[in-house]
């Protein structure tokens, strides 16, 4: 592969996962870039999620269809690969072949055959835990690390360029995950006040993550790099909880649950879930995540690509809360 930068004026890009949470955020920004955009959708009906001003070419195919992938990758410079399992609870350690690994293997083969220059892979900070064997080690993170390895191997063979973006937990309207669950439970009045927690976590806004993806697509500096993407802030779970109550216009209760109660409730919920007695995302892992630091540094992507996060959870939180209070508005 040549090493000069991809022409940033009007690159030809393919977006997978365009109808997902991050994909929709990206597609809202792409019209301003005026790129030649194509999206790969598994379901034609999901094209309703795309902004009309995107004016994208739509290919309907599955990531397991080599014929569809070859068509999607034809005459593309860059693939922005956002498709895949988005949440820890969706991944089982018992799956023999990770579908995300199979998908990226198929995508790399098609992209290489069609002379695609670069793949930008949206991964997760949980891949870092799997890689270092420190922190929150999950089957999900192991799977993301395996996906990264497939892409890196192809890049090392000279088939294409690879850029990997490891996102921390993402916030924004339409978000899912633990913070969204916490907001919903507070709205319903089913979550008692948490213990006073001193741990800090990194987060990133969906729009900032979309901007990082755009920057990574055409930067010569990004070639072969793996970046962690955060908004640069260190958030306290207790401060987030207080901000949720404020966004709801509610008074924060004057008492807090003892830490042991939180641990026991999380462990019991996890046991019920494993026994099939109750479905839910709460487990002893929830307790660990609520009580341990989970901080990441974004200095590399800021320094290399000039990434400059604009959003902050507390500024976006009222809109997120409103969307969960009135989800159909």
Question: Would you name each region that the model predicts?
Answer:
Residues 13-33:
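N-terminal Rossmann NAD(P)H-binding glycine-rich loop of SDR-like oxidoreductase domains
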Residues 16, 40, 79-83, 119-125, ...:
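SDR active-site strand-loop-helix element
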Residues 56-102, 110, 125-134:
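NAD(P)H-binding glycine-rich loop region in Rossmannoid oxidoreductase-like domains
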Residues 102-142, 163:
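Conserved Rossmann-fold NAD(P)-dependent oxidoreductase catalytic core, especially the SDR/UDP-sugar
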Residues 128-129, 163-181:
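Flexible, glycine-rich beta-alpha linker
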Residues 138-163:
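Active-site Tyr-X1-5-Lys
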Residues 175-181, 195-217, 224-228:
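Substrate-positioning beta->alpha
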Residues 219-281, 298, 304, 311-314, ...:
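Mid/C-terminal beta-alpha module of Rossmann-like enzyme folds, strongest
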